[in-house]
Amino acid sequence: SSMYCILVTGVPAAGKSIMAEAVAERLKLPVISKDRIKELLFDSVGFRSRKEKVNLGIAAMEIMYYAAAQLMRAGLPFILENNFEYSSRSGMQALLDEYNYAALTLTLTGDYRAIYQRFLERESSPDRHRGHVVNDCYPEREERGTEERRNPHGETKAAGISYEDFVQGIERRGFDAFSVGGRQIKIDTTDFSKIDA
């Protein structure tokens, strides 16, 4: 099939969005990012509990698939950026089958220790969207409107996840083992400066 899409996936903080943007720039393709959709939902809808946050994540996934299906209907190539996991396989496979699309999967992985360090730095970075970091309430009510809430040292800092839990989550959910058949390229992003996009 000449119709194809590129799936950029892999472990948390492996650099999926940077990679997706680089490939998009080079191939002049649109990128649909589940995290970006999630951020739009965080800002426009918000959440007041962990459950509501999870529901926005599910909604973001549905919107991502909807957009992908529209591009497939038009026979256009595109990039999907998402932390695909074992449980996403059937939904993605069904789309590929329905529209007779081939997928090239770029799986970003590397030394878990180094990537875990990057994960911790990202979670406490002022540039990280707060909706990803907090679990109870976003926008954060008490400090709304002040610069205070962007303070990475505030008490709403990410509940620290241990290295063991980080690795266990990757293995249990299959972040670096996801596959829908087709061509798959594993990219080691332990050291970003060594990657030749």
Q: What is each residue range found by the language model?
A:
Residues 17-73:
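Conserved substrate/cofactor phosphate-moiety recognition/catalytic segment
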Residues 12:
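The conserved Walker
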Residues 8:
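Hydrophobic anchor at the beta1->P-loop junction of P-loop NTPases
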Residues 5:
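Walker A (P-loop) ATP-phosphate-binding motif of ABC ATPase nucleotide-binding domains
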Residues 36-38, 109-114, 191-193:
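Conserved nucleotide-binding/hydrolysis micro-motifs of P-loop NTPases
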Residues 56-103:
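Glycine-rich phosphate-binding loop used to anchor ATP phosphates in small-molecule kinases
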Residues 99-121, 187:
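Conserved phosphate-donor/acceptor-positioning beta-strand/loop module used by diverse small-molecule
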Residues 125-195:
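Small-molecule kinase domains that catalyze NTP-dependent phosphoryl transfer to phosphate-bearing small molecules
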